[in-house]
From Swiss-Prot:
Site, as annotated: Important for activity: H100
CDD domains xrefs: NAD_bind_Glutamyl_tRNA_reduct
Organism of this sequence: Aliarcobacter butzleri (strain RM4018)
UniProt xrefs under InterPro entries: 4pyrrol_synth_GluRdtase, 4pyrrol_synth_GluRdtase_dimer, 4pyrrol_synth_GluRdtase_N, GluRdtase_CS, GluRdtase_dimer_dom_sf, GluRdtase_N_sf, NAD(P)-bd_dom_sf, Shikm_DH/Glu-tRNA_Rdtase
Other comment: During catalysis, the active site Cys acts as a nucleophile attacking the alpha-carbonyl group of tRNA-bound glutamate with the formation of a thioester intermediate between enzyme and glutamate, and the concomitant release of tRNA(Glu). The thioester intermediate is finally reduced by direct hydride transfer from NADPH, to form the product GSA.
Lineage per the UniProt record: Bacteria, Pseudomonadati, Campylobacterota, Epsilonproteobacteria, Campylobacterales
Keyword Thylakoid applies: no
Catalytic activity: (S)-4-amino-5-oxopentanoate + tRNA(Glu) + NADP(+) = L-glutamyl-tRNA(Glu) + NADPH + H(+)
Family as reported in the entry's similarity comment: Belongs to the glutamyl-tRNA reductase family.
Active site: C51
Gene field: hemA
Lineage top rank: taxon: Bacteria
UniProt domain comment: Possesses an unusual extended V-shaped dimeric structure with each monomer consisting of three distinct domains arranged along a curved 'spinal' alpha-helix. The N-terminal catalytic domain specifically recognizes the glutamate moiety of the substrate. The second domain is the NADPH-binding domain, and the third C-terminal domain is responsible for dimerization.
GO BP terms in the entry: protoporphyrinogen IX biosynthetic process from glutamate
Binding site for substrate: T50, C51, N52, R53, S110, E115, T116, Q117, Q121
Name used for this protein in its record: Glutamyl-tRNA reductase
Amino acid sequence: MSYLVISFSHKNTDIKLREKLAFNSDEDKDRFLKLILENDITKEAILLSTCNRVEIITRSLNIKQSSKDIIEKLATYSKVDFDVLYDRADIYDADGAVHHLFSVASALDSLVIGETQIVGQLKDAFRFSQAKGYCSLNITRVMHYAFKCAAQVRTATSLGTGSVSVASTAVSKAKDIIGNTKDVKALVVGAGEMSELTVKHLIASGFDVTIISRDTKKAQNLASTFEVHVNVEPYDKLTQLLITTPIMITATSAPYPIITKENAPSSNINRYWFDIAVPRDIDENISMSNLEIFSVDDLQDIVNENMSLRAEQAKTAYGIVSRMSLEFFEWLKSLEIEPIVKNLYLKGNEIIDKKVKNAIKKGFIDSKDEENIRKLCLTVITEYLHNPAKQLKDISKNMECDLVVGTVQNMFSLNENSTSKNRYKCDHLSKN
């Protein structure tokens, strides 16, 4: 059994392919996770789908077979040829899968190094699979350590400061284009988490912000969370606002373009539209004078600047990821050893109990001496097992740990199930 991660991201796929791979609803995610868990080789699974990546995180009995099965099902879902997906996919297993997952959680694999959204998105994906029963002990353990790693990276580096999200990068680009942002109108289409971040950065940059959404009530609630005044307009005014507003950033979860060649108006002013949604909100075929359209992949210049400024911090962060990956596997081995050590002592107590009762029954010892004899036997067992227990704990740091675990279980007839029911709570799940 090994960890397996199949990754499609901005590093190996363009936005056109990521649009087809994106999971836009919980229903789609639920159906896909059910499908990949139907076979006997994929045991637990999490699906992470964001504007820049689709990651399938699993435990598998057969890496090659499981990878092929998952990509086949993804090909059916996305209507993309299997060979195309298989050639593009980054497939990680065992320690490589853990290192990649920790890098993703720590925002080192993001389009914008150090962006702050990914760990929350990963927690949401984990919660979803937990609630549906699609992941249990093994995935919980690795996710716990992934969030622990991300927290250490944030604490030890300054990667979480500055322009560190797709939304903030889009706003930074808009600010570079406009120059003086005082009284410059900016329109945000959508009222979700990405839109909230966008509004926050637009306000901080001095723009006059308007929110528009199909759900006007949701837009009003979002606007009310800011200390400065944020305008809210009904959705039927979208076309009119697109004519008069120089900056527009759209981040809806619509599964299809909401701004098309048919409804995109022309204008006499210079306009700059930023589409940070995947699938894209703006039809890629729109082209007119005085209009520039930027997708997520078009923000690469700022991303490259971001990466060069953060290179030293990223080096420190990767060191943390590597160390935490090694610690994780050592921790896993210790979790396997500790229940065995405990069971050895329990087994000794069971034997003491059985033999003392039998001796009293046969008249070999007086019942009034039972407590003292138990104490003596327990002292003997404890002293006898002390060195083997210490050796077992030391062996947990070595590669032969798995072999030793099985051997000790067989030698002492220990119940294997008792060592595998150590359900682990993810302490970092409730933390932001």
